[in-house]
């Protein structure tokens, strides 16, 4: 609490240019620190430290982008409407970067099968132990350098902003195996 008060006070008296320079420095330092680490190491640390916040009773929380209704609601409405328009046998969904499954859980009723994929092994172990639905399964995989599961529809939601352009290119090169791909 005291640290927060000090930060607010410093922001109030520091020149705006100094604040921008500080934020550029922090981003560069974080990028440099993460450039020699695997995505598994980076994202495992994010969950372990609660960088995206903490959920109600869950040990894993993917942040407000996955839990805020005004953000998630329109996405779930659009994807579920699309899934309902398909024959049931064509609703095999692969969710790359499934995170804490808070969004995927809302789409599950419209899927003939759902495979959630994430690079964090502990998250995948947790989901496989906690989610007991016959159509849901979770797989640990590196979507950049690893194999992707088979399916009809691929969802990539709020993943690419965390990857470099080269990493995004590697993922995009693998997506032709899916009939439909939604990238948001």
Regions found by a protein language model. Give the residues of each.
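Hydrophobic adenine-recognition pocket in adenosine-nucleotide-binding enzymes
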Residues: 159
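Short C-terminal domain-edge/linker segments immediately following a structured domain
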Residues: 124-128, 169-171, 184
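Conserved N-terminal segment of class I S-adenosyl-L-methionine
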Residues: 3-146
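A short, conserved alpha-helix within the catalytic core of class I
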Residues: 162-174
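Short, conserved loop/helix-junction motifs that constitute active-site signature segments
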Residues: 107, 173-177
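Conserved beta-strand signature within the Rossmann-like core of class I S-adenosyl-L-methionine
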Residues: 177-184
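A conserved beta-strand element that flanks and buttresses the S-adenosyl-L-methionine
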Residues: 155
